[in-house]
Swiss-Prot record:
UniProt cross-references to InterPro entries, sorted A to Z: dUTPase (IPR008181), dUTPase-like (IPR029054), dUTPase-like_sf (IPR036157), dUTPase_trimeric (IPR033704)
Name by which UniProt lists this protein: Deoxyuridine 5'-triphosphate nucleotidohydrolase
Superkingdom to which the source organism belongs: Viruses
Encoding gene, per UniProt annotation: DUT
Keyword vocabulary terms for this entry: Hydrolase, Magnesium, Metal-binding, Nucleotide metabolism
Alphabetized PANTHER family for the sequence: DEOXYURIDINE 5'-TRIPHOSPHATE NUCLEOTIDOHYDROLASE (PTHR11241:SF0)
Similarity comment text for this entry: Belongs to the dUTPase family.
One Gene Ontology biological process: dUTP catabolic process
Molecular function, one GO term: magnesium ion binding
Organism of origin: Swinepox virus (strain Kasza) (SWPV)
Signal peptide segment: none
Membrane-spanning intervals of the chain: none
Length: 142
């Protein structure tokens, strides 16, 4: 069964998210405006796109690997819930040491649609033990 995501363009600069390759998991998100992002700064990039994500799904905003590798760009965590109807904004982080220019129509991030479960939270006094126990960061090897 196919999933449908309804899209609204808020301006002529908006571009409907799309996959660049048939095997791509993420749908590219595009800037609707031009920006200059100073080194070690973050901005909210507007896409001028609103989405209606199906129930029991959400959209996860993720970085584009080429921007990360080549320009030290990161994207702030973003979860787009199925009941959100506002504009999709991207927290764009320049970790590089020079200005980064974004032009109208530049691909800046991607959205990956994932199914979600809604478990019932149950308070208990203790948890069953496992081999790992409460060993945290790095405990399973580097």
């Amino acid at each position: 069964m196919s999933l449908y995501v309804k899209c609204v363009k808020l301006s002529n600069n908006a571009i409907i998210p799309n996959r660049s390759m048939s095997g791509s998991a993420g749908y590219d998100l595009y800037s609707a405006y031009s920006y200059t992002v100073k080194p070690y700064n973050r901005i909210l990039v507007r896409t001028d796109i609103c989405l209606m994500i199906p129930d029991k799904c959400y959209g996860r905003i993720s970085p584009r690997s080429g921007l990360s590798l080549n320009y030290n760009i990161d994207i702030g965590g973003g979860v787009i819930d199925s009941d959100y109807r506002g504009e999709i904004g991207i927290v764009f982080i320049n970790n590089g040491c020079s200005d980064f220019n974004i032009k109208v129509g530049d691909r800046i991030a991607q959205i990956i649609f994932e199914r979600v479960e809604y478990p019932i939270m149950e308070e208990v006094k203790c948890l069953e033990d496992t081999e790992r126990g409460n060993s945290g960061f790095g405990s399973s090897g580097m």
